Amino acid sequence: MTDYIPTFRFDGHLTIVTGACGGLAEALIKGLLAYGSDIALLDIDQEKTAAKQAEYHKYATEELKLKEVPKMGSYACDISDSDTVHKVFAQVAKDFGKLPLHLVNTAGYCENFPCEDYPAKNAEKMVKVNLLGSLYVSQAFAKPLIKEGIKGASVVLIGSMSGAIVNDPQNQVVYNMSKAGVIHLAKTLACEWAKYNIRVNSLNPGYIYGPLTKNVINGNEELYNRWISGIPQQRMSEPKEYIGAVLYLLSESAASYTTGASLLVDGGFTSW
């Protein structure tokens, strides 16, 4: 039975994390560093991504007190551009001298308009980033692994509880449909790539009390109370509360039979 005791160590593994400057990504990257993974940090702004890499290195040495910090690299990448994505992923493999075994796609965004007034350009951009971007990074990740016959890889696509339900009071039709697409994309890829032993799952957060949410609330206590009134735990989540779920989904020893899953981590919001 000892060979079935799961481990969350990722020593020697390479993980690509998109949206690496975001609040959720920051928590997940810190978790991956703590468990030994090398990390390629991808975001749309090279300068900001390089600055975040320096912050993560400082965290690893001063907070985690690691004597040997996992290797990191920062890359500018617009995930809505397929050609760019494939070029950046190829460069990552060249720089690290190995193919990534794990992909965490956190890149994406949200904006709200009433459905009848939703600008077409805004809608198209969000679908390209949130949904097609998830497809493009998954393709660029899996294709060389399939070609080389490397097994045991894993993908976590960040969806949202808004891909499973329509949460009041936001007018976010395109965000909702893009995240619903991400959930079904993960299921479809899981089925297509099971024969290559590449697992694909979606993690679907509830409300996260981070910079973006704070900006939306902007001191509006009524809006805040309205949001948490639908959460059985009566609070929003913190980014760090998603680390364990993502490490589980990435771990081949812990989650070898978990693929195509849509994991809701929402404080019970969708249970009511």
Swiss-Prot record:
The keyword NADP applies. One of its GO terms (biological process) is L-arabinose catabolic process. It holds the Pfam family adh_short_C2. GO terms for molecular function: D-arabinitol 2-dehydrogenase activity; L-xylulose reductase (NADH) activity; oxidoreductase activity, acting on NAD(P)H, oxygen as acceptor. The keyword Oxidoreductase applies. Induction: Strongly expressed during growth on L-arabinose. It catalyses: xylitol + NAD(+) = L-xylulose + NADH + H(+); D-arabinitol + NAD(+) = D-ribulose + NADH + H(+). InterPro entries: NAD(P)-bd_dom_sf, Sc_DH/Rdtase_CS, SDR_fam. NADP(+) binds at L24, D78, Y175, K179, I208. NADH-dependent L-xylulose reductase; part of the yeast pathway for L-arabinose catabolism. Reversibly converts L-xylulose to xylitol and D-ribulose to D-arabinitol. It has a much lower activity with D-xylulose. PANTHER family: BENZIL REDUCTASE, DEHYDROGENASE ARBD, PUTATIVE-RELATED. Belongs to the short-chain dehydrogenases/reductases (SDR) family. This is NADH-dependent L-xylulose reductase. The gene is ALX1.
